């Protein structure tokens, strides 16, 4: 995501996708207890390592204990097995997990998280290799052919099905 902080160290292509705002995935039977962001104080909240979702946790859930893992599927498994209390995810990904796993839900407090940032391709600051014009041209072509929309829809659907888990330790 092209955030102001990331713009300080890299240049970015034209946006190719803007997700719905980030959401907090929790166990369905606990969802009602997370009405506000303050309800996460003292709780373990997962986020994918080296992503803007880590920043969401540290900035907007300052009383939470951040748990960073490389893979979203690992974070969701940690949630299912009770090793974390919640996971902050891209909105569409969180929705897919909640829709495909009845043991999971979106925390009501998610509405307080704010807006999503556009997804772009990062290049070295100053674009010393001159890549941005070709990248932007490719993005424009894929957008005009609806290829990006098709890819993103398929990827979001797959993200919720990548690991279909249940709390009784069985994997489907």
How would you name each of these model-derived features?
Residues 1-9, 56-59, 85-115:
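A ligand-binding cleft/hinge motif common to bilobed small-molecule-binding domains
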Residues 40, 79-80, 121, 135:
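Hydrophobic residues within well-ordered alpha-helices
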Residues 18-26, 53, 95, 99-172:
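Periplasmic-binding protein-like
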Residues 1-39:
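Acidic, polar ligand-binding/catalytic clefts
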Residues 32-33, 67-81, 92:
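Short helix-initiation/N-cap motifs at beta->coil->alpha
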Residues 17, 53-71, 98-102:
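Ligand-binding cleft/hinge of the Venus flytrap
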Residues 37-50:
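Short loop->beta-strand "edge-of-pocket" segments that line small-molecule binding or catalytic clefts
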